[in-house]
Each structure stands twice: as C-alpha cells, then as structure tokens.
Amino acid sequence: MSNMQFSRGFNPFVILFCLAVVAPIISADVAILRTDYYQKTCPDFHKIVREAVTTKQVQQPTTAAGTLRLFFHDCFLEGCDASVLIATNSFNKAERDDDLNDSLPGDAFDIVTRIKTALELSCPGVVSCADILAQATRDLVTMVGGPYFDVKLGRKDGFESKAHKVRGNVPMANQTVPDIHGIFKKNGFSLREMVALSGAHTIGFSHCKEFSDRLYGSRADKEINPRFAAALKDLCKNHTVDDTIAAFNDVMTPGKFDNMYFKNLKRGLGLLASDHILIKDNSTKPFVDLYATNETAFFEDFARAMEKLGTVGVKGDKDGEVRRRCDHFNNLNV
C-alpha cells in the first residue's frame, strides 16, 4: 500500500482537475516571450529590422540614443507595450505629449515607423510595435559599440496611453537618488541596476532647459567643472528663445557607447543634476567608481538590466493587440 495518506474529504483528483482548468486562465494574459517568436510567422523579421536601423543610424547618428531613450520611457509606464508611440487625438492626450516626453527625438519614432512599414509588407499583422521598439533598441545599441543582449519577443501592443500618468513614473533631471530609485524599484530594479541603466547617457543629448538651472544665478552648481560650465553657458545663452538647443550627455565620446559617462562624473562633467548626484550619493558612488574603471562590469550589468527592462509589464493576447499602425490603436475609440 502506498505511504501517501489523505485527510478525510480530500480528493487529489479534484485538485488536479481544478489545476488543469485554472492554469490556462492564469497564463492567458501573460505574454510568453522567446527569442525565436517570429521564426515561422515572420522569418525575415531580424533582417528587416537590422537593415532599417543600419540605414537610419548612418543617416542620423543620434538615432541610437533616441531609440534607447524611447524604449526606456515606454517600459517604465504601463510596461513595454508601445504606449509611448500612440498619437494624441481629439479625445485623448497621449503619453508622448506630456511635458516630460516632449523632447523624445523624432528620429526614434521614425525608425519604428520605417520598420513597421517594411514588416507589414513582408508579414502583415504579425509583428507588434512593442517588439519592433525592443529589437531596434538592441540592434542600435550594439551598432554604436554597446553590449549585446538577448531580446525575447512576443509582446503585444497596449490599449492605453495617458499623458497624465507620465509624471511620477519617469525620472526627472532634478530628482534625488531616493526619488529616482523609487521609480526604478517599483519596476523591480535594484540600485546597482539603476546606475547601470543610467549609463545609457553615454550617448545622446539633453536640451538646455533640462540643466540650465545648474548654470545660472544663485543656484548655479559650483561642482561642475569650470571649463565645462563656461562652455555650457555659452551654448545655452539663448535657450529661452530656442528650446531646441542641446548638449551631448557625454562630452568626450558622444557617439560611442562606452564607460566614459562614469569617468566624466568623476571629473565634474555630468550634464544633468540627476547624473551628478550619482557620484555624490554614498549609495550610488561605489557603482560609478566600479563602472568608471571597469567597462566590462558596466557592459555586463547593463546587458542584464536591459534584458530585464524588456520584460517589464509586457502584455499578452487579452491585454494587447498587434497594431496596424504604431501611432494608433486598432480600435480608434479606445
């Protein structure tokens, strides 16, 4: 006789039946991501993305940084569901039109549109905009010298994009380390992962309005490298009448993904206040020191954090769709 004993009224077969019924319900809304998701349904997916990003990056070298930033802003609000791509219409102000997102580069939106157009000709109605943004980001990061990381696919595009939800979910340039980490933490990221992802500022640029308060008046930051501060003051002197004026986040190697961002922080060359505080705060300084001296450690941590970022809040079939156009929901009344 078996040694297994069951209490009175306990029927294991009923439990097994319940699990069999409930399991599909539990998993139905969860996207199952895998790297070969489009192998059969859109076999040219990787080729089409790679060719499009190569052409665009050659034409406009800031595309990589812009797309990386767009991906981050997408994933940190409502998850990686392409909600940041939705255009505002007469009955909804979308995420991309919130003040915190108004400087998201047009080239980043453009590359997603280019890829979507090509994919719709090759395999219509198959590839989500969320997957396009994720894959394009990885390919562009590696193109400019950054680390390779796996991109698992199978995300669906979300049904919601609300501008009023942006604030409090995307870090701001003047926030403290605890404030910024609070945003990262609720998305499952540690302090070390936060610093690693901040290293994305090794490429790209920021507009003067995002750091001008560090340059002028009684609140001017005395810890900025004096020569750097003087150059920024000259660059931004007309920023109130021309809000397109911008400076490179990494003044030394702005187009190369490397660990120079962290080296710059130690020299007083951090552009944003939120950059500079990483070297000032005792909780984040050890990671800045590590990455400044060990690019391999930075690349490894960044790659792992990016793989993790790509899984934040992904949508399954019930909670998402494959949009026909990345800037509109399929149901325009949503």
Swiss-Prot record:
PROSITE patterns attached to this UniProt entry: PEROXIDASE_1, PEROXIDASE_2, PEROXIDASE_4
Binding site for Ca(2+) 1: D74, G79, D81, S83
Cofactor: heme b; Ca(2+)
Active-site residues (renumbered): H73 (proton acceptor)
Disulfide-bonded cysteines: C42-C123, C75-C80, C129-C326, C208-C236
Secretion signal span: 1-28
Site, Transition state stabilizer: residue positions: R69
Catalysed reactions, as listed in the record: 2 a phenolic donor + H2O2 = 2 a phenolic radical donor + 2 H2O
A matching Pfam family: peroxidase
GO cellular component annotations of the record: extracellular region
Record flagged with keyword Glycoprotein: yes
GO molecular function: heme binding; lactoperoxidase activity; metal ion binding; xylan 1,4-beta-xylosidase activity
Swiss-Prot/TrEMBL keywords: Calcium, Disulfide bond, Glycoprotein, Heme, Hydrogen peroxide, Iron, Metal-binding, Oxidoreductase, Peroxidase, Secreted, Signal
Cofactor note: Binds 1 heme b (iron(II)-protoporphyrin IX) group per subunit. Binds 2 calcium ions per subunit.
Binding site for substrate: P171
Family annotation (SUPFAM superfamilies): Heme-dependent peroxidases
Positions of heme b binding: H201
Binding site for Ca(2+) 2: T202, D250, T253, D258
Known EC number: 1.11.1.7
Known function: Removal of H(2)O(2), oxidation of toxic reductants, biosynthesis and degradation of lignin, suberization, auxin catabolism, response to environmental stresses such as wounding, pathogen attack and oxidative stress. These functions might be dependent on each isozyme/isoform in each plant tissue.
Similarity comment: Belongs to the peroxidase family. Classical plant (class III) peroxidase subfamily.
Additional detail: There are 73 peroxidase genes in A.thaliana.
Protein name, UniProt field: Peroxidase 65
Record organism: Arabidopsis thaliana
Gene name of this polypeptide: PER65
